[in-house]
């Protein structure tokens, strides 16, 4: 069975939560809870409040996501 395509959206980190979780406000105004992807964790990429990020959302649960990129 093939994996479902994830939805990629841009947003801004508005709050830092425990356990490398973040509250991200998407461009369309929705607020989601997101965690860091494994490669970002491996390369020690730090994310701070106010950073512009790219978030992948699954079509099954649009309230949770994975941060895959931090814009400079």
Curated annotation (Swiss-Prot):
This is Translation initiation factor IF-1. Component of the 30S ribosomal translation pre-initiation complex which assembles on the 30S ribosome in the order IF-2 and IF-3, IF-1 and N-formylmethionyl-tRNA(fMet); mRNA recruitment can occur at any time during PIC assembly. GO terms for molecular function: ribosome binding; rRNA binding; translation initiation factor activity. One of the essential components for the initiation of protein synthesis. Stabilizes the binding of IF-2 and IF-3 on the 30S subunit to which N-formylmethionyl-tRNA(fMet) subsequently binds. Helps modulate mRNA selection, yielding the 30S pre-initiation complex (PIC). Upon addition of the 50S ribosomal subunit IF-1, IF-2 and IF-3 are released leaving the mature 70S translation initiation complex. NCBIfam families: infA. Transmembrane segments: none annotated. It is found in: Cytoplasm. Belongs to the IF-1 family. The keyword Manganese does not apply. InterPro entries: NA-bd_OB-fold, RNA-binding_domain_S1_IF1, S1_domain, TIF_IF1. CDD domains: S1_IF1. Keywords: Cytoplasm, Initiation factor, Protein biosynthesis, RNA-binding, rRNA-binding. Residues 1-72 form the S1-like domain. SMART domains: S1 (SM00316). It comes from the Bacteria. PANTHER family: TRANSLATION INITIATION FACTOR IF-1, CHLOROPLASTIC. Signal peptide: none annotated. One of its GO terms (cellular component) is cytosol. The keyword Protein transport does not apply. The gene is infA. HAMAP family: IF_1 (MF_00075). Its main location: cytoplasm.
């Amino acid at each position: 069975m093939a994996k479902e395509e994830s939805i990629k959206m841009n947003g801004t980190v508005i709050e830092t939560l425990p356990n490398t979780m973040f509250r991200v406000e998407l461009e369309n105004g929705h607020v989601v809870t997101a965690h860091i992807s494994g490669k970002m964790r491996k390369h020690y990429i730090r994310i701070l409040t106010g950073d512009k990020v790219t978030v992948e959302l699954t079509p099954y649960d649009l309230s949770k996501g994975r941060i895959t990129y931090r814009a400079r």
